[in-house]
Structure formats: C-alpha cells, structure tokens
C-alpha cells in the first residue's frame, strides 16, 4: 500500500523531472552565452537598453538546444521509468523520443524567452543587469 508520504515524494520527483529541461536550458545559457546581445544593443528613446548584455543569441540557442537534448533523453528514459515506477507516477511523462524532443524544446525555449522578457521588464522599471527583481 502506498502512503501519503510516498505519494508526496514521488510527486516532488515527478515535478522536478518534468521541469528538468528548463533547468538545464537556464544553466546552459550561462555556459554558451556571450557574444551578440539579443537586443542587438538597441536602446529606447531615453537611451536605455531594451534587454541588456546578459541575454545573448548564443545563450538563447545553446540553452534551447540543451533543453531539447534533455527532453530527448527523458523521452528515451520515459518507458523505462514507467515500467519500473509507473504505480507511483501520477503525472504523465513523455514516453517516446518525439514527445521528449517537443516537450524539451518547449520548456527550454520557454525558459529562455521568459528570461528575456524578465530582463526587458526589469529594464523598463530601471533595475540594472544582475540585480534581483522585487517580487
């Protein structure tokens, strides 16, 4: 019989497993980053940068690729995980390579776009690069 503690633990593991492509994407953007900024160094009418130097094309592309690869790995591992732990998993996970690639791409690219939008919004309210946004 499965108790509530086991359900909670497996739910946490499943959530972390699902969000892993976004985490890998964010970390990889730092590794692959640098180069031309996503905003092409454009400024608004007040002379402020649109996004800043911290969000680059190499980071966007590298992060998205790595998130997609993580999703592909999860797609390959999905059937094995379900076979061995299916009774504990209450959230659907990708069960083949194509699903893994699609989910990995969407989560990885979504994380990169989310970072760029966050940087854009921070610049609009005058928060500098590397400074936390008050939430």
Indicate residue ranges for each PLM-predicted region.
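Interhelical loop and helix-boundary elements at the membrane-water interface
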Residues: 2-135
